[in-house]
Amino acid sequence: LWKNRDVGNSNQEYHYVDDGRIPFIGLTYRNEDTFQYYAGVNAVGFAVENSNSYNLGRAAGGNGWGWGDDDGEIQALALATCRTVDDFQVLLDSLDNAEGRTLNSNYGTFDAFGGAAMFETEGFEYFRHDAADAPDGYLVRSNFSYSGDGLDNRPNYWGPNRHDRAFNLFKSAVDDNQLTPEFVIQRVMRNLAATDMNDYDLPYRNFYEGNEFGVIPNGETVCRASTASIFGYVFSL
């Protein structure tokens, strides 16, 4: 399970949390003293991360956590209480039946029993996609959802290049039997290929579109200007 976290605040840190429920390690902002985490793994092997989704339906106007984005609270609660991917679905069901969710998100989940699924969530509905049902056994998302609208005309802020580049890298690794943690860290997490750029060498000794020699614009690359932290979790059955 992997996520590049793209946010304006580059001061990020991991916390170890043990409040009497399931202990976990979670990613949050430096000096954050609220119960909000944006990726993590707990002591029983359940892990979660998310990305914003910009093509789903209506989000809730507010809920018991307030009026702001609730992805940090949802993931903190999941890490403290969930043991399996199915447990996370139960958590989402409880929110559907209550006040809903204020931020549309793609939640990637993973557990120690072999479960792996992506939940595309809007205010009062979600769509589950299991890795076991995917053609090659992996799931990739950026800032749009497969169950949402507009897939034939994806604007740049949805991250189409980031999605397509990561997807193609995973596909080539699976096809060549080279999908390893090292591949994800070295070839995917740090990838700087811009739109329509098949590959590149560093230092880059070429021209990309109208840029100066040796310059790759990194606003829409997998590892980009706003990438503030990385989350990755590997579990071997």
For each feature predicted by the language model, list its residue ranges.
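A contiguous strand-loop segment
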Residues: 1-71, 89-104, 109-116, 125-157, ...
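N-terminal start-of-chain detector that recognizes signal peptides
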Residues: 19-21, 79-82, 200-205
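Conserved aromatic-histidine-acidic binding/catalytic patches
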Residues: 63, 76-80, 219, 223
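A gly/proline- and charged-residue-enriched helix-loop-helix capping module
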Residues: 72-87
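C-terminus-biased signal that marks the final domain/tail of proteins
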Residues: 87-91, 100-103, 112, 136-237
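Short acidic, glycine/serine/threonine-rich loops at helix termini
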Residues: 120-122
